[in-house]
Amino acid sequence: MSDECLIAKIVYLSLQQKEVTQQMIADELKMSQQSVSRKLKELEERNLVRRSLSKEGEIIRVTENGEKLLEDCLSMMRATIISSHVLEIRGRATSGLGEGRIFLSMPYYMESFKKFLGFEPYPGTLNLVIYDRISLENRLVLDISKAINIPEHKEENRVLGAVRAFPASVNDLKPAAVVFPLRSVHPKSVIEVISPYHLRKELNIKDGDEVVIQAYA
């Protein structure tokens, strides 16, 4: 495991727990404590982590140098993403619960998509389930890519959550966009696509059909 991945795992655990112990890291990585201890010692010698003893065991904290290493790694990933521009995601069409229709019936979102994406979407989303590893990796890359951001909007008695969007094509049809509402209940393996077209009708898409998305990041 690379130093960056181990540091990222420690940071991830620290977001869930007040203190991260060596045992927690070993359990999370399914590695022996001896192997984890050797790796942590190397990181400590490079001033990337600090180790201290407590009644819970050995506590691990990431240093400023460790955080900087992680930030540099993330910057390189972003640079790679920017240079690639297009991310292909394949998925199979699936019926949603009607949430997309409700979401797109709200004037704020309709007006915002028209303003930021240049089109007024059909009142409904095309939901796709990602089924292959490369497509899922590309989907996850979008999480750290620069998106078109629809800001959160406060109304009198409710708050409409922010949305991240990426211009896209659907089976080569444009315009369209992949959208990620920040309050979505969907897992990472499900994406929502909007377009001014009724995509199922326009492209004759049925549940289970493979759909190819080209997302522009």
From Swiss-Prot:
Keywords: Flavoprotein, FMN, Kinase, Magnesium, Metal-binding, Nucleotide-binding, Transferase. GO terms for biological process: FMN biosynthetic process; riboflavin biosynthetic process. Its cofactor is Mg(2+). It catalyses: riboflavin + CTP = CDP + FMN + H(+). Its EC number is 2.7.1.161. It comes from the Archaea. Residues 1-86 are annotated as: H-T-H motif-like. Residues 87-217 are annotated as: Riboflavin kinase. Binds 1 Mg(2+) ion per subunit. Pathway: Cofactor biosynthesis; FMN biosynthesis; FMN from riboflavin (CTP route): step 1/1. CDP binds at residues 96-101, 197-200. FMN binds at residues 184, 192. Mg(2+) binds at residues 125, 127. InterPro entries: HTH_MarR-typ (IPR000835), RibK_CTP-dep (IPR039063), Riboflavin_kinase_archaeal (IPR023470), Riboflavin_kinase_CTP-dep (IPR023602), Riboflavin_kinase_dom_sf (IPR023465), WH-like_DNA-bd_sf (IPR036388), WH_DNA-bd_sf (IPR036390). It is an enzyme of class 2 (transferase). GO terms for molecular function: DNA-binding transcription factor activity; magnesium ion binding; nucleotide binding; riboflavin kinase activity. PANTHER family: RIBOFLAVIN KINASE. Belongs to the archaeal riboflavin kinase family. Catalyzes the CTP-dependent phosphorylation of riboflavin (vitamin B2) to form flavin mononucleotide (FMN). This is Riboflavin kinase. It comes from Metallosphaera sedula (strain ATCC 51363 / DSM 5348 / JCM 9185 / NBRC 15509 / TH2). The gene is ribK.
